């Protein structure tokens, strides 16, 4: 069911998949470049994610074993897909208002369950799964055609998009797009390496919900590799009940002996869990850290007066959850970003949840509204650091969110809030939340007006609010022209601006390697190469700036080119 697969941060369907313009030569000219139709898609207003219960040590009292008819597991994501379609202004086929009830259709003749027929996905079908169809992304299903799988995986693994908002949006589109494997006609195996790489990259970004949705679309039990990833991500999401029930019915699918023992205990099968632990300990099949944590987890009588265990040398999702279950939680700040997801539930306190939310928001893995909800979750209990940021944002949000905002109060609270979000490197999250409401302030000549204009320029759709704004300085004139994709119409006010403008010039040539990828029709690999070039530019390699922007335009990604160019100029104070 698609509604269960979509993560709350997933972009809403655009009103239409708009073409991004046409030009005689896709690599030349300052006008809009031809497009595959890919837009920088808008994020839907998300609902709160499910707050799962913590893992606890097993209750030794006799309990009835839950079968498949037991308590239903809540969906992985709380978003209602049909509501999302309605909010996006898209009607379901045949939906023309409320239809009268028609009881003339098929009527059941028996209370027996109907026969259910299943169809196993082929390896190529499993590798092509995605959450965004071609009609939404504008990318063809042949996105990866012709490329070497190993080369694509290397590019995806080494691509860093932390604090590169335009690249984050594009990368999520690539990772979630429905597209055939690079060699769908070749020998097939139960695992598609590119699919596994996509899942791993989503987890690396902290986007656990879409990663799990991809696994479910491909089939959680299709292969040991997919099940192992499903098990690990379920642990970090607090949704391990489903994989543990699978392990209870099919022990051989367990990714490890430790996982099987944990799931037996999680399913209240104490005797089996204890027997497995004793046997594994005698045979030496468990890592020392696994054996220590499982022993403490299963033997509640050891808790009182027990010496705290040393932290595991190599933390895994299972060891992380076991540590939390015995009352010795591990901090997530030094762990991979996926572990921060677990802190969103507030089990480690509001401060830890705020820090986790900011960490995930920097990679676009957390919806802006969820971030705002956590910022608004209480009153700061101290001053300094993140508490000053919370106080500043709360004051501004209260001012601009009033039924009749006091414009003087909004102008007073905006600069501190903006500075606070700059400190957190979350300017684009702030822009996504408030740009629309700040549009009427952008024409004012004070500090708040300048911040409001910058917020509009960093918003997902800057041109929606710029028509009524007159530039006050040469810099503002250039930025406004750049947002419209016409930087050649005004004089660049600085050397950096001139470099950016060259990305929209007919004279800018692409690097030979990138031009060859485009000429050979290797669309997906060419996009990844352009993204890597842009990341080098943001790291300080000025010579890569214009070619990177020109590459996006040559690939038809005009919206991405404009957003990337604006972010180079507006976020370059990050260092």
What is each stretch, according to the model?
Residues 2-12:
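Bacterial N-terminal signal peptides
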Residues 19-575:
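Alpha-helical solenoid repeat scaffolds
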Residues 13-19:
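Sec/Tat signal peptide C-region and signal peptidase I cleavage site
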């Amino acid at each position: 069911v698609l509604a269960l697969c979509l993560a709350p941060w997933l972009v809403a369907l655009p009103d239409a998949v708009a073409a991004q313009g046409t030009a005689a030569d896709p690599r030349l000219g300052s006008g809009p470049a031809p497009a595959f139709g890919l837009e920088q898609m808008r994020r839907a207003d998300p609902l709160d994610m499910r707050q799962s219960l913590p893992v606890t040590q097993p209750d030794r009292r006799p309990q009835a074993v839950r079968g498949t008819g037991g308590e239903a597991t809540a969906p992985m994501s709380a978003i209602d897909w049909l509501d999302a379609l309605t909010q996006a202004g898209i009607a379901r086929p045949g939906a023309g208002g409320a239809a009268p009830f028609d009881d003339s259709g098929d009527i059941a003749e028996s209370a027996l369950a109907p026969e259910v027929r299943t169809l196993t996905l082929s390896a190529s079908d499993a590798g092509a799964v995605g959450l965004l169809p071609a009609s939404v992304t504008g990318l063809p299903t042949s996105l990866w055609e012709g490329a070497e799988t190993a080369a694509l995986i290397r590019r995806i693994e080494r691509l860093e998009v932390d604090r590169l908002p335009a690249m984050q949006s594009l990368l999520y589109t690539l990772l979630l797009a429905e597209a055939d494997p690079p060699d769908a006609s070749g020998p097939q195996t139960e695992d598609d390496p590119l699919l596994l790489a996509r899942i791993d990259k989503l987890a690396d970004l902290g986007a656990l919900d879409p990663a799990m949705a991809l696994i479910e679309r491909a089939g959680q039990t299709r292969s040991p590799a997919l099940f192992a990833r499903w098990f690990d991500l379920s642990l970090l999401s607090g949704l391990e009940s489903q994989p543990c029930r699978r392990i209870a019915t099919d022990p051989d699918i367990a990714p490890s002996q430790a996982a099987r023992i944990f799931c037996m205990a999680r399913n209240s099968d104490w005797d089996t869990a204890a027997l497995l632990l004793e046997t594994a300990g005698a045979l030496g099949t468990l890592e020392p850290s696994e054996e220590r944590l499982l022993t403490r987890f299963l033997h509640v009588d050891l808790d009182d007066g027990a010496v705290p265990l040393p932290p595991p040398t190599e933390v895994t999702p299972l060891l992380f959850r076991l540590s939390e279950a015995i009352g010795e939680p591990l901090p997530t700040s030094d762990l991979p970003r996926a572990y921060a997801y677990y802190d969103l539930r507030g089990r480690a306190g509001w401060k830890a949840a705020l820090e986790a939310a900011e960490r995930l928001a920097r990679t676009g893995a957390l919806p802006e509204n969820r971030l705002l909800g956590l910022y608004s979750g209480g009153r700061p209990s101290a001053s300094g650091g993140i508490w000053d940021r919370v106080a500043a944002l709360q004051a501004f949000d209260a001012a601009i969110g009033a039924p009749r905002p006091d414009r003087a109060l909004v102008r007073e609270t905006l600069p501190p809030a903006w500075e606070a979000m700059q400190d957190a490197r979350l300017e684009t999250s702030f822009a996504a939340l408030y740009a629309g409401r700040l549009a009427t302030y952008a024409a004012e000549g004070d500090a708040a007006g300048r911040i409001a204009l910058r917020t509009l320029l960093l918003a997902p759709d800057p041109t929606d609010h710029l028509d009524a704004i007159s530039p006050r300085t040469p810099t503002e004139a250039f930025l406004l022209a750049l947002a419209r994709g016409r930087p050649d119409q005004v004089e660049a006010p600085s050397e950096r601006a001139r470099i950016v403008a060259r990305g929209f010039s007919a004279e800018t040539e692409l690097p030979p390697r990138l031009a060859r990828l485009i000429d050979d029709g290797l669309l997906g690999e060419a996009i990844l190469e352009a993204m890597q070039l842009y990341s080098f530019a943001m790291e300080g390699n000025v010579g890569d700036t214009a070619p990177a922007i020109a590459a996006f335009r040559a690939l038809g990604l005009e919206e991405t080119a404009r957003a990337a160019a604006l972010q180079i100029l507006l976020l370059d104070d990050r260092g």
